[in-house]
Curated annotation (Swiss-Prot):
Gene Ontology biological process: cellular response to interleukin-4; cytoplasmic translation; translation
The protein's name: Large ribosomal subunit protein uL3
Membrane-spanning parts: none
Stretches with biased composition (Basic residues): 18-31
Function of the molecule: Component of the large ribosomal subunit. The ribosome is a large ribonucleoprotein complex responsible for the synthesis of proteins in the cell.
GO molecular function, one term: structural constituent of ribosome
Family: Belongs to the universal ribosomal protein uL3 family.
Main location: nucleus
N6-acetyllysine carried by residues: 136, 286, 294, 366, 373
InterPro entries: L3_arc_euk, Ribosomal_L3_dom_3_arc_sf, Ribosomal_uL3, Ribosomal_uL3_CS, Transl_B-barrel_sf
Residues carrying Phosphoserine: 13, 304
Gene designation: RPL3
Pfam families (alphabetical): Ribosomal_L3 (PF00297)
Length: 403
């Protein structure tokens, strides 16, 4: 029998088995940060949509490092995060077998984009979701029952979470069905949490009330789907020599004769991508404000810095490729994040106490690149492009036709 002479580490991790398509499109938070009653009441997660990537220039503040006080260029991802709307409150009690839902209370008014989430086919449905439930808020018996529910939640619950949804109409996406999730409320006593949640029923919660500048967060999402792939692409096994009979992008030995089965740990072809993943420790470089109207003027300069005073928005020329324009609040994260453009991402507060110097470093952005991401962009703004190009033929023709 021939065998290889040396052993080697296995290719690919078995920690992510089974490598199959994710059952859910929205990233699921499997554990929220530990509660600390001494802190003020706050939310622990938020939903955003991946718009695209660009790069920034910043000055490093790391005394003792070779790049201290020097400029570095870094890749960043823009995640659009319009305000989320709170539409419900859920109380949990702790049992020996984990958390159990105790009571769920929904708001009186729920928007259609949220109701769509409860239907497979909104167009053909009667659109009756929550019509009976909202009457609770209008008659006296219903109000008494709701007050009773809230008081029993204060008495018995240990964990309070809010049900919040995204606002799809604010985004440049075709989808109308909002994404809905439970977000844990941390900080303060249970009574304070419940009062905080009640005040915000049917209200919008912006991203800057959840996360702060220079904070380290975790990003949960589903990766880009790649379809059915061979073993070399999927597990990064070594290609066999050129003269190998019946193909070389294969595994040479898939196991012994007996046991007469292929072990689960052997690399095989199959689905690659569209897997649920959690990436920890993504640093927030900037929490940007969306377009706003001030004194009758539309303010767009959310990509200006103290060093680059040009009046420009975060959108590159021509918008983000395969996404469009970011007009709402956004979060700028260092490096890349999972998923394709338009993918919904769950941003969660870090589960760990951050102590490393890089995590606590203050970020001082000098420049944000807004050149076109479709080809080799060279202009930061349309004004800069027009000044360089001069009068164009199409402008002259349009002027002549207008005259």
């Amino acid at each position: 029998m021939s065998h290889r002479k040396f052993s080697a580490p296995r290719h690919g991790s078995l920690g992510f088995l089974p490598r199959k398509r994710s059952s859910r499109h929205r990233g699921k938070v499997k554990s929220f940060p530990k509660d600390d009653p001494s802190k003020p009441v706050h939310l622990t997660a938020f939903l955003g949509y991946k718009a695209g990537m660009t790069h920034i220039v910043r000055e490093v503040d790391r005394p003792g490092s070779k790049v201290n006080k020097k400029e570095v260029v870094e890749a960043v991802t823009i995640v659009e995060t319009p305000p989320m709307v709170v539409v419900g409150i859920v109380g949990y009690v702790e049992t020996p077998r984990g958390l159990r839902t105790f009571k769920t209370v929904f708001a009186e008014h729920i928007s259609d984009e949220c109701k769509r989430r409860f239907y497979k086919n909104w167009h053909k449905s009667k659109k009756k979701a929550f019509t009976k439930y909202c009457k609770k808020w209008q008659d006296e018996d219903g109000k008494k029952q709701l007050e009773k529910d809230f008081s029993s939640m204060k008495k018995y619950c240990q964990v309070i979470r809010v049900i919040a949804h995204t606002q799809m109409r604010l985004l440049p996406l075709r989808q109308k069905k909002a994404h809905l999730m439970e977000i844990q409320v941390n900080g303060g006593t249970v009574a304070e949490k419940l009062d905080w949640a009640r005040e915000r029923l049917e209200q919008q919660v912006p991203v800057n009330q959840v996360f702060g500048q220079d904070e380290m967060i975790d990003v949960i999402g589903v990766t880009k789907g790649k379809g059915y792939k061979g073993v070399t692409s999927r597990w990064h096994t070594k290609k066999l020599p050129r003269k190998t009979h019946r193909g070389l992008r294969k595994v040479a030995c898939i196991g012994a004769w007996h046991p007469a089965r292929v072990a689960f740990s052997v690399a095989r072809a199959g689905q690659k991508g569209y897997h649920h993943r959690t990436e920890i420790n993504k640093k927030i470089y900037k929490i940007g404000q969306g377009y706003l109207i001030k004194d009758g003027k539309l303010i767009k300069n959310n990509a200006s810095t103290d060093y680059d005073l040009s009046d420009k928005s975060i959108n590159p020329l021509g918008g983000f490729v395969h996404y469009g324009e970011v007009t709402n609040d956004f979060v700028m994260l260092k490096g890349c994040v999972v998923g394709t453009k338009k993918r919904v991402l769950t941003l969660r507060k870090s589960l760990l106490v951050q102590t490393k110097r890089r995590a606590l470093e203050k970020i001082d952005l000098k420049f944000i690149d807004t050149t076109s991401k479709f080809g080799h962009g060279r202009f930061q703004t349309m004004e800069e492009k027009k000044a360089f190009m001069g009068p164009l033929k199409k402008d002259r023709i349009a002027k002549e036709e207008g005259a």
